[in-house]
């Protein structure tokens, strides 16, 4: 409702969603491709900016796609757990005697990340402007979709609880001698024990297994 009245507002809304998810989803490909992209694509199609019709790309879809790509990179750089390669940098720094915590990374990345967050959509809006500037129907569409989805389910509440537990442990885990890897397994265990996820879900996450193998 706040961001949905213009194409620029939609860009900021999608970027904000990415930033909010980044601390607890340490895979920028899963976050960008699996969560943000389907939402962004649905928005574009709702305004007749269709991937299969090149003549409609510039109406809205191209702008939102480029913006989501850059916002994903910005969100990934702001948090230690924003992408899988960040903990590797932390390890390399530790080998040089430099201790980087979740909080110190966030403190260093917050200001440049925040500046980029506000500047990038505006720059893209000037350099690669969408043909559609006003999207007044977006809030109504969102409200209708929320109504169709119904109230938040028990599993969604449990997922939200796990999100905040993980975020808290990643931030304060150092003081409790709980490292980031242990925190990730705690979160996975909670989701499995509460049946939010099944082992079949875990096995089907090919991207996560790729990350474990290649970044281990």
Where in the sequence are the language-model features?
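Flexible loop linkers connecting adjacent transmembrane helices
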Residues: 1, 44-53, 131-144
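Residue-level detector of functionally special positions within alpha-helical transmembrane segments
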Residues: 26-27, 75, 82, 101, ...
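Short, flexible micro-motifs
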Residues: 78-79, 85, 112, 190
